[in-house]
Amino acid sequence: MAAVEANGTFQANTKTTEPVRPLANFPPSVWGDRFLSFSLDTTELEGYAKAMEEPKEEVRKLIVDPTMDSNKKLSLIYSVHRLGLTYLFLQEIEAQLDKLFKEFNLQDYDEFDLYTTSINFQVFRHLGHKLPCDVFNKFKDSSSGTFKESITNDVKGMLGLYESAQLRLRGEPILDEASAFTETQLKSVVNTLEGNLAKQVMQSLRRPFHQGMPMVEARMYFSNYDEECSTHESLPKLAKLHFNYLQLQQKEELRIVSKWWKDMRFQETTPYIRDRVPEIYLWILGLYFEPRYSLARIIATKITLFLVVLDDTYDAYATIEEIRLLTDAINRWDISAMEQIPEYIRPFYKILLDEYAELEKQLAKEGRAKSVIASKEAFQDIARGYLEEAEWTNSGYVASFPEYMKNGLITSAYNVISKSALVGMGEMVGEDALAWYESHPKTLQASELISRLQDDVMTYQFERERGQSATGVDSYIKTYGVTEKEAIDELNKMIENAWKDINEGCLKPREVSMDLLAPILNLARMIDVVYRYDDGFTFPGKTMKEYITLLFVGSSPM
């Protein structure tokens, strides 16, 4: 095997002739073995669970309080949702919202200010009710058709309208206008603001709540919205205890997958790959943070780490001949195929087959082996997709945009990650749920498209510099004869419309339960987190480092 320099690049061994390899020189891990040393104190974990009982009951009573004003009730539910506590009171919240939605009267909103209207709109839309966007009509000037100048003096209201606009659907031009208008206005005043309002506006402009990672958004909410939280003392108390409880559980999960990764010795056998265990765990945590999904997170993290090894082998080390052999071996999925692949990748291949076999064996006992098979088939699909990309690169071929997207939706890794996320979710992922996934519904297509194009828009220059296969940006330019800026603008419009389709799919009546839709929505959110401003996975020193520090390194809030 080739020697490795300190900077991570491979050099040809002087004693043997090494093939020319497309080395990427990925940055090393930011974290090293930091998370291996964590030791879970179960007494502390149980202490937080017990301490949550009293404030949880107090918050439950507030939610069901029949004497509370409806706007105050919706404001309370809004804070509960922003704090990541909805799942603790799901039945109570749904009952309250069902009742309030049935009582909805557009004329009532004539009396509400912009902030109240926005909060109510967000609560209903976030939790599945299609409150009409007509509630914002009164804030537009009837003669000019634009938003009234007077609302520019209400920064809190404009912030609420900006967040509301992220929940828009196709055919809601007032919210398209609201998004552009409020973004411009908020950017013009943000540097004049002070205190928590300044933090709230900066946070929202950087990434609106609806596009954010739920755990991080919850952590920042009780830091930046203490006034909203402090109306009811039990709410911030519960939120902080809840965060601390989850933090302990999740640090233990991160320790488990970090130890597994180290024991598998991938950094020794395939040292050219990106060492990104905490980043992958963070990515999966973004799909579901609730305690009941602990096993699911561990399983999905391991499978996604397999994907990193595969991706970097195809993209940053293997020759085209080696890629063809490895793809064939993955298609065969048989230990006897190990003899045909290069020696450096054999340990990975064996571990891959062994881990999937063990998963299938364990879930077969529960009658749920089909979810493992679906994940395995998605893994085989992506290997074939990576081969297609490699063949294009090898021949210098730039695919047409439709051709690129057909393969690119596979190589985005969305299908592998989303199906692997189902494996450990338990009884809710039965044959009907898998059949729904396999039908490739519109909501899934939209999230998948975001996964592909958000990545392309952010990474196309880096990929060009490395001489890798053309991205969606390059294919769009070639196919439609547009400039680079025009291509990026068009891809961003496609991303924007895909978000509208996801929003529509999460409204009642839903095709499947929100338990199944949430990972789809959240995977789109995590793509935004990782790729909005940079390639946060390849170069994790900014956003992902900040988020990992906030959730696993920084001190807990109590």
Curated annotation (Swiss-Prot):
* Domain notes per entry: The Asp-Asp-Xaa-Xaa-Asp/Glu (DDXXD/E) motif is important for the catalytic activity, presumably through binding to Mg(2+).
What family does the Swiss-Prot or TrEMBL record give for this protein? Belongs to the terpene synthase family.
Q: Where does Mg(2+) 3 bind?
A: 455, 459, 463
Q: What's a Pfam family this protein contains?
A: Terpene_synth_C
Q: Which organism is it from?
A: Cichorium intybus (Chicory)
Cysteine pairs bridged by disulfides in the record = none
Database matches in SUPFAM superfamilies: Terpenoid cyclases/Protein prenyltransferases, Terpenoid synthases
Q: Which GO terms describe its molecular function?
A: germacrene-A synthase activity; magnesium ion binding
Question: Which parts of the sequence bind Mg(2+) 1?
Answer: 311, 315
* Motif stretch (DDXXD motif): 311-315
**Keywords for this protein:** Lyase, Magnesium, Metal-binding
InterPro entries per UniProt: Isoprenoid_synthase_dom_sf (IPR008949), Terpene_cyclase-like_1_C (IPR034741), Terpene_cyclase_plant_C1 (IPR044814), Terpene_synth_N (IPR001906), Terpene_synth_N_sf (IPR036965), Terpene_synthase-like (IPR050148), Terpene_synthase_metal-bd (IPR005630), Terpenoid_cyclase/PrenylTrfase (IPR008930)
Q: In which tissues is it expressed?
A: Expressed in roots and in green and etiolated seedlings.
Can you name this protein?
Answer: Germacrene A synthase short form
The reaction(s) catalysed by this protein are: (2E,6E)-farnesyl diphosphate = (+)-(R)-germacrene A + diphosphate
Identify the domain of life: Eukaryota
The record's Gene3D superfamilies line, in alphabetical order, gives: Farnesyl Diphosphate Synthase, Terpene synthase, N-terminal domain
EC assignment: the record states 4.2.3.23
